[in-house]
Every structure is written in structure tokens, then in C-alpha cells.
Amino acid sequence: MSAPEVLVVLPTLGDRLDTLRLSIESVNEQRADLEVTLIVVTPLQAVEARALATSLGAVVVDDPKEGISAAINCGLDTRTTEKYYAWVGDDDLIRPGGLAKLRSVIETEPGTVLAFGGCDYIDPEGRTITVSNAGRLATLLLSWGPDLIPHPGTMIKLDALQEIGGFDPSLRYAMDLDAFLKLRKHGSFAWTRTPVSAFRWHPDSLTVANRLASSREAESVKRRHLPRAIRPISGLWHRPVRWASAFAAGRGNARARAL
């Protein structure tokens, strides 16, 4: 058996056992194409989730209870031979062949530090609501518009991620956006429009249930990455982006209810 190439981190509170199983199984399917280390970060009291993860071959790490960014960073700290990082939530999925596809994209050019693919938005029953596959447009909008790079469905070179210090533990919603903006200084981004992941859209998803707080945190992150001279006027475009994001979320909820 060759050394693992991809470190997949899955943080969970352990309260979604049915979808957690599906998420872990979707990662295990990737082992047909490449070697993967799956780290499940979960609290000590999540006994059933820990047992489930262990039975399915994951490495279980204790959640430090300092927020989701700190949990992911704990997973990153377990790195051994892996070159790449990928994330999956406890109700997300990696599509068959998804990690291998992302690896081929990120390895196309030596200066690439991040690769992302399309992401299916699915309802609680797994039916596709819509697909996010913005490609190059996502990179153009990143610093001022909506973040269209899906965290599930992204692969990052671990050396570059460690150079930026991992994920900011003070952030609850936009830690991926902050990392993406920092990573631009370390190399280029590449993409495929092929769906490589699925995000389960339901009312208690962290960013779905807390849309306003998520938008405000994202605006704060984007503002601090702007040139100092234009930060005071960033509200001119951040507010319309917030409105557009809320409108898109409303349409997503409507589509989910209509299925």
C-alpha cells in the first residue's frame, strides 16, 4: 500500500449519524482511485459517532470545542505523508472519483495551490436542487462578490495551507473564504465544472440557517483583504451581494420544497 496522498477532514458534533455514515462512505469510495486519510474530529461525548467513524476506518480526533475552524486545524495537525487537503461536512458527499479528479486538476500546473470542482446542492433526501459550477467566474468574484468556490469540492496543497496558518479560529462561517483569499498569494487556482461533491441543503445547515451572520462575516473578511484605501466604500457592493445571496438562498429553499 502506498502512502496516503489526501488528508480529508470531517468535523462533526455527532448528532447526524445517518448522514455522517453516508459522508464517510463517500470518502471511502475514493480509495479505489487514491490513498486517503480520513480524520473525523468530534467531541468525546459523541460516543455513537466515534464508534461509527472508527468502524468505517476513519481516524478519530478529539474536538477542542473552540469552533469549527479549530476543529479543522486539529485535523490538519495529524498530517503525515499527505500532500493535499480536502473537506467534507457530516452531511456532505464526495462524488465517486471526485478526489481523483481534483488531484488531476491541481497537478496540471506546478504553481497551482487550489483546485475546485462543481458541487451539487441536494435536499435531505439526496435529490439535486441545483448545481454550482462557476469555474473561472468564481475566482474573479472571490475578493468582492459571492464566494462561489465550494469548500466541499475543493483540494488544497497542504504545504500552502500550512504556510497561511490553516483556518482562522475566530471565524465561524467564512473561514474557507479567508483561506482562499490568503492562498491567492501562494499560487494559482484551477477548476473543473464537473461535479465532484454534494452539499446537503437543509434549514439547520450552519450557513443556511444563519444567512445574515454568514454574509456579515464574509463581508468583514473580504474588507480586510481589500486595499486600505477602498475599504471604507466596500459597502457599495457588499450590500447588493448580500441581497443577491439572500435571494439565491430563498430560491434554493423554494426548489427544495418543490421536489
Model-derived features: positions:
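Short, acidic, metal-binding catalytic loop of nucleotide-sugar glycosyltransferases
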Residues: 24-35
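N-proximal low-complexity "stem/linker" segments adjacent to membrane-targeting elements
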Residues: 1-26
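Conserved nucleotide-sugar donor-binding catalytic segment
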Residues: 136-217
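Cell-envelope/extracellular polymer assembly enzymes that use nucleotide-activated donors
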Residues: 4-7, 37, 178
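Glycine-rich, basic loop-to-helix element that forms the pyrophosphate-binding segment
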Residues: 63-81
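A conserved acidic beta->alpha catalytic loop
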Residues: 40-50
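Conserved donor NDP-sugar-binding/catalytic core segment of glycosyltransferases
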Residues: 93, 97-129
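Short beta-strand-to-loop acidic/aromatic patch adjacent to the donor-nucleotide binding site
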Residues: 82-93
